[in-house]
């Protein structure tokens, strides 16, 4: 995957502004081989559990629970639901609840051509890499990886967004039950 010069300049500026905590250019380093890592697979299960998409239909789930039918592209549909008396609107979709804008950025950088389960998995690993957590996931530095992706997925422990999150204990349990190893 090759970023255009303008995209690379933007990515470098973002890397600088975030002091390296968020680096779009890291997404370019992710390959399908990263999906073969057991810790990566287990970590993806944690995210899906947090996002409420761990069931069979998770890859086809819109925000709020409705299902979409085509994997040709992100469904690009904003859905409004009422939770705890508050109306919330979101374009989040798929196993990792990608917003339309996040998916477009991810797909463009990573060269993803559809919204199939394989592309969603690869895109999620790209977002993990962008947050500087992929090496931590692979090495079993679970708590550190969770901390780094909490700004990417609002359902992760420590997320600053004020939405419901899964507990760190639940996240660890899902991770180890899926074969993930915690080393630190």
List each language-model region with its residue ranges.
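Cell-wall polysaccharide-cleaving catalytic domain and substrate-binding groove, primarily
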Residues: 1-113, 122-184
